[in-house]
Curated annotation (Swiss-Prot):
Statement: the UniProt record of this protein carries the keyword Membrane: no
Organism name: Arabidopsis thaliana (Mouse-ear cress)
Annotated keywords: Repeat, Transferase, Ubl conjugation pathway
The encoding gene: PUB17
Protein name (database record): U-box domain-containing protein 17
Gene3D superfamilies noted in UniProt: Leucine-rich Repeat Variant, Zinc/RING finger domain, C3HC4 (zinc finger)
Pathway named in the protein's UniProt entry: Protein modification; protein ubiquitination
Length: 729
């Protein structure tokens, strides 16, 4: 028996109830035939007048079969079949209860078939046209399976023992003969359309863009997709299938991705920038600040990749995870390129690389493969065992890339010369395209999108501004695009302007995230910090922003703190004060402590941090309750405060309550680097020869001094490690 469960996985919005898969054990006799009459009548009334885009003949044939069942069930209801009286009469006639039991079992099985028929017909009525077209052979097979099961059931059903009238019995027997003769039917016209759709995919794969005449004939004339709204609905449905796709289904997620790209291209090629209500809102609310334009779209369509599966450098799903000497995992291509560019530190932790060897992380790769299979995502590793499989999976990706390139060309034209509404829609689409894949980010920038997006940053329309700054953020993740953005005249200043006075909260947060992304390049850190109001706005966002805004701000401030020339700007702009205040916030305390540990290495920074009343208490709180990495950052900051902050600041640290106990705990339970920092700080205490502390923690440290590793004496500048990532929106 064909499984009906497949239909529930294909349409997330309308899942069938559990009744679709379980026989009605609690129904018998009169109640059962009444239920069957109700279900069959509902199917006929709901779908008789429906105009099916595809599977017309199969759907109509199934509905006609159900119409005959309606007549059967209504007769059984009218004759009170299954009641005590009718059962007694039947037993007298047949002198056996076998036929009655057989009939009851058949009717219960028919209950399941009717429910599955309803699900299948409803699926054909509600699904997108393109999806039905792609699934045409499979869905035809589902109809044939149902027909075969109906035929088998009618062969078993004891028709002669149901007490039917001659007319109804003749209809049932005719239905039985027709069901036996029925064959799998696949509409030739539908198959021809499906082949045309695949030919468009092949054309893009081979670098040959189909003509607008052919595309219009296919989408508008043949499929009846006549406006932008309908086209967008088709795209959203296909994207939904990528999220929910079962690994057994065809086509694969990567192939569907190619069809999504083609449909998106046709949307703008054939219908321009007609939109379902967005233009009206843009034109009538140009200055109204509103929260969450971008956030409303995030998560509804695209699947969220677990952060442990994302490469910290490329921010894409890792296809070949490898481990470096610091223990961090990166995608092979990304970390290899990082090392080839002359970097000798870990991108995530800042630690020096002991060597350039990389070791495959097979355990993580297996987890990624399992997750991709469960999520219906094609896992395209460049280091698979089968080159042919890798090549086959890459072909549809090429088609998607070419179709997206063609779409980007149209979008940029409207971005340059279109109306305000068209520019806003174009910016939104570019943002979505730049959301995934370095190829998308690369050719969007190469096609010239950045100058036009830069102009939209100063737009007085909230939606346009938010989409443009978010698109800029997504583009900046690609390394080469960072220089394109920084070299574009006034682009950096415009991003800072959005940070300072953006029309939506999300726009301000995404501007901060963009600055964090750009500041990953060392030579840009100083340029960013000296822009008027930049540090001040980041400090304000860290103090008053949303949890996500605080995270964006603290990571940007951390990056700026890594440049020694930015120390004075961090102090003047309130960055130091906001970082000290952030030590109380669990969500950003670790990064704040890391930034302070960097700034405090300079005497100017140490002096400024020492003047903050809550600095020492905040760092000690981090030592007490922070994460292992946060404790490392906190003890490192306190160590540098004692060394560079002057006698008064050192005295404040040494006299802090509970410092002895915290150091002792850290010396035993901290990470290797935290223990080294704690030992160095303890030696600073000893050199101060503070009598009060000598009777406390020094007794402990003095006893361990003779046995500690000599390496502690020189290990006083271990880089600070924090975990940070760029959001892709």
């Amino acid at each position: 028996m064909a499984s009906a469960a497949i239909f529930s996985s294909l349409r997330r919005r309308r899942s069938p109830s559990l009744e679709a898969f379980l026989a009605p054990v609690d129904l018998s006799g009169v109640a059962l035939v009444q239920t069957l009459a109700s279900i069959s009548s509902e199917v006929v009334s709901c779908f008789t007048s429906v105009r099916f885009s595809f599977q017309r003949k199969n759907a109509r044939s199934l509905i006609r079969k159900i119409e005959i069942f309606v007549v059967l069930f209504e007769f059984l209801v009218d004759s009170n079949w299954g009641s005590t009286t009718t059962r007694t009469r039947a037993r007298r006639r047949s002198k056996s209860s076998v036929s009655e039991s057989t009939a009851l079992l058949c009717l219960k099985e028919l209950y399941l078939l009717l429910y599955r028929s309803k699900i299948l017909v409803d699926y054909c009525a509600q699904s997108s046209k393109l999806w039905l077209l792609l699934q045409n052979p499979s869905i035809s097979g589902y109809f044939h399976d149902l027909n075969q099961e109906i035929s088998t059931l009618l062969d078993v059903l004891p028709v002669n023992d149901l007490g039917l009238s001659d007319d109804i019995r003749e209809q049932i027997e005719l239905l039985q003969r027709q069901s036996r003769k029925a064959r799998l039917y696949i509409d030739k016209n539908d198959e021809s359309l499906r082949e045309s759709f695949y030919s468009f995919l092949d054309g893009f794969e081979n670098g040959k863009i189909p003509s607008s005449v052919d595309l219009r004939m296919f989408f508008v004339e043949k499929l009846g997709i006549r406006d932008s709204k309908s086209c967008r609905s088709e795209i959203e449905f296909l994207e939904e299938q990528i999220v929910n796709h079962d690994g057994d289904l065809e086509p694969t997620g990567s192939v569907i991705n190619g069809f999504v790209a083609i449909t998106r291209y046709c949307r703008f090629l054939l219908f321009g920038f007609e939109e379902d209500g967005m233009e009206w809102w843009i034109e009538n609310n140009p200055k109204k600040p509103r929260k969450g334009f971008v956030a409303q779209e995030i998560g509804d369509t695209f699947i969220t990749v677990p952060k442990d599966f994302v490469c910290p450098i490329s921010l894409d799903l890792m296809t070949d995870p490898v481990i470096i000497s610091t223990g961090q995992t990166y995608d092979r291509n990304s970390i290899a390129r990082w090392i080839e560019e002359g970097h000798c530190t870990c991108p995530k932790t800042g630690q020096m690389l002991m060597d350039s060897r990389i070791v495959p992380n097979r355990a993580l790769k297996n987890l990624i493969v399992q997750w991709c299979t469960a999520s219906g995502i094609s896992y395209e590793s460049e280091f698979t065992d089968s080159p042919n499989e890798s090549f086959a999976s890459a072909l549809p990706t090429k088609a998607a890339v070419e179709a997206n390139k063609a779409t980007v060309s149209i979008l940029i034209k409207y971005l340059a010369d279109g109306s305000q509404a068209a520019q806003t829609v174009a910016a939104r689409e570019i943002r979505l395209l730049a959301k995934t894949g370095k190829e998308n980010r690369a050719y969007i920038a190469e096609a010239g999108a950045i100058p036009h997006l830069c102009r939209l940053l100063t737009s007085e329309n909230a939606i346009a501004q938010e989409n443009s700054v978010t698109a800029m953020l997504n583009l900046s993740i690609y390394e080469k695009n960072k220089s394109r953005i920084m070299e574009e005249g006034d682009c950096l200043e415009s991003i800072v302007s959005v940070l300072v006075s953006g029309l939506t909260v999300e726009a301000q947060e995404n501007a901060a995230a963009t600055l964090f992304s750009l500041s990953a390049v060392h030579e840009y850190k100083k340029r960013i910090a000296i822009v008027d109001q930049c540090v001040e706005a980041l400090a304000l966002l860290l103090q008053n922003g949303t949890p996500r805004g605080k995270k964006d701000a603290v990571t940007a401030l951390y990056n700026l703190s890594t440049h020694p020339d930015n120390c004075s700007r961090m102090i003047e702009g309130g960055g130091v004060s906001s970082l000290v205040g952030a030590l109380k916030n669990e969500g950003v305390a670790e990064e704040a402590a890391g930034a302070l540990a960097l700034l405090v290495r300079q005497s100017l920074g140490a002096e400024a941090i020492g003047k903050e009343d809550s600095a020492v208490a905040g760092l000690m709180g981090m030592m007490r309750c922070g994460t292992p990495r946060g404790k490392e950052n906190a003890v490192a900051a306190l160590l540098e405060l004692c060394r560079s902050g002057g006698a008064a600041v050192a005295e404040k640290v040494l006299r802090a309550p509970a410092i002895a106990g915290l150091l002792q705990t850290l010396l035993f339970t901290g990470t290797k680097r935290a223990r080294r920092k704690a030992a160095s700080l303890a030696r600073v205490f000893q050199r101060r020869e503070n009598a009060a502390m000598r009777s406390g923690v020094y007794g402990f440290v003095g006893n361990t001094n003779g046995n500690r590793d000599g390496g502690f004496t020189t290990d006083v500048s271990v880089p600070i490690s924090i975990s940070i990532s760029v959001p892709v929106l």
